[in-house]
């Protein structure tokens, strides 16, 4: 009998809604990389998620660069979603396969043993899942196992304890009905934002590992829809203009201009513990900015942001992206996961079970009532005073990068590039 397959399917969704909020507080209270105020709690051990979040960021930047070489258009994915699913899968891997998965994510297993990695993800997922009145962030893992299988109880127990993964019995010989059941679960868990997400699978599928992350936030400073201009120009490249709706506001935001990377970086806050970085390359400098995307660059930006009144122009758009990553992940070290040498016997107690597909889907929606990303143009100076008539203009009218962070854990929830805001 030929090999039977396990699938890893991930999806993410974002929806951002309006809020009439309190006056803007001091900009020092929420920032990427900001240190916590000194208190008696500073003597307590650091949360376990600190052992994984820097590695997730590094993994995300490496994966982004590979995607940028392969994809000409919009890019969007969730580093937390993808890395946590691969780490969960490693629970059922043995020997070299487990080592390969975790090391490909960027973990030094001598410094951070596998047990500490899993406890770090447990801490991260638990913290992100804590209820918040101003930010809704819902993550989940589900395992769909063929009903003929006898999965290892140790794997199921660890997956539930560390990753909150719930296991379901499935009949993959009835592919259409089972696919509908899984899609119904996803639609319910993402409040109808993701519909019909699951790709077709064959009758010899044994397992589907599904991850979802649903992000719902409110702008700290919502846009006035009456200020939106319906037909402003967005440059797909230096020769091709596109007419799109452009939102506008004058508000306080943090920003900087990075001469080394040739880009403008704008930080926009949400209510709650999330913020968005919008990175606008100078004309013709996108590849230079992408090459400069390193953890050190992000730390430098976090230290240099200054608050200023800005005349901000952001596109209104909705984009999605879907990837089959089985050709991309081997380029960052995950090769054996997709061949018969992979040892995933910790899941089902059998060898010769391999992963056939890693699918990842992300959705982002941005409008006046709540925004998540924007298109690019730059701020080249910082004003000496809050003068409404002389506020510098941040006009996002060409391709740009977006990085969406949860501040408490310093975790990168979404990373992407908006090339065409009208691509859908």
From Swiss-Prot:
Main location: secreted
Glycosylation (residues): 108, 171, 352, 387
Cellular-component GO terms for this entry: extracellular space
Any GO MF annotation of the entry: serine-type endopeptidase inhibitor activity
A family per Pfam: Serpin
InterPro entries xref list: Serpin_dom, Serpin_fam, Serpin_sf, Serpin_sf_1, Serpin_sf_2
Superkingdom, natural source: Eukaryota
SUPFAM superfamilies: Serpins
Secretion signal span: 1-21
Keywords: Glycoprotein, Protease inhibitor, Secreted, Serine protease inhibitor, Signal
Annotated localization: Secreted
Family: Belongs to the serpin family.
Name this polypeptide is given: Serpin A11
Naturally occurring in which organism (per UniProt): Mus musculus (Mouse)
